[in-house]
Amino acid sequence: MKLLVAAVGRWRGGPERALFDHYVGRLKGGLAVIEVEERRPLPVAERKAREAELLLAQLPPGAFVVALDEHGEAWGSERLARELDQRRLEARPAAVFAIGGADGHGEALLARADRKLALGVMTWPHMLVRGLIAEQLYRAQCISGGHPYHRS
């Protein structure tokens, strides 16, 4: 199963990128990034709807979509590993972790999401979230493979 991050916004250099690259280098099968961007100055609701439209257009058919959302569930690493293992058993072609823009996801993306995941109650910079997701995907892979990286 292919792993993807679909994100609003473009990469900049810096330590966030280094963190992401570090864990992607450890992941078997890698982690692809799809970036979309709406540059026109639009009202918040219109921008969120447009960003959702752009993200949805990039999703592989049949993908398991996890929207990173402040109102989502908080999972432990073991839950993430179980969710991904289950999607592999279902022969899903991809698992996509969608990161919205500064104002969050549009309704269309949230409606399409199979799960909504919160990374706790704190607000995180969007570029740092990419690194956090990469680390958690590596950790989930280790849990599923019985590797000692993760300690319960």
Swiss-Prot record:
The keyword rRNA processing applies. One of its GO terms (molecular function) is rRNA (pseudouridine-N3-)-methyltransferase activity. NCBIfam families: PRK00103.2-3 (NF000989). Specifically methylates the pseudouridine at position 1915 (m3Psi1915) in 23S rRNA. Belongs to the RNA methyltransferase RlmH family. Homodimer. This is Ribosomal RNA large subunit methyltransferase H.
